[in-house]
């Protein structure tokens, strides 16, 4: 296995692990619409368009 492929493999594994993390850890969520953000966060959603919001489930200040 060449070094390039090894780095790519490690990158894929690491990114998958980041997505799995839960339990009150702030994680960026890519949201294109208010509805996208509402899937992850309760409370009022303000102008969530084409950016990443830091939020955890239940955080009213998602975007």
Swiss-Prot record:
One of its GO terms (biological process) is killing of cells of another organism. Residues 1-15 form the signal peptide. Transmembrane segments: none annotated. The keyword Amino-acid biosynthesis does not apply. Disulfide bonds join 31-48, 37-53, 41-55. It comes from the Eukaryota. It is found in: Secreted. Keywords: Antimicrobial, Disulfide bond, Fungicide, Plant defense, Secreted, Signal. Its main location: secreted. One of its GO terms (cellular component) is extracellular region. Belongs to the DEFL family. This is Defensin-like protein 278. It comes from Arabidopsis thaliana.
């Amino acid at each position: 296995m060449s070094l390039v492929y090894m780095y790519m493999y490690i990158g894929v594994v690491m990114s998958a692990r980041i997505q799995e993390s839960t339990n009150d850890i702030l994680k960026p969520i890519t949201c294109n619409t208010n509805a996208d953000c509402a899937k992850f966060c309760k409370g009022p959603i303000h102008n969530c368009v084409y950016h990443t919001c830091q939020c955890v489930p239940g955080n009213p200040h998602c975007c």
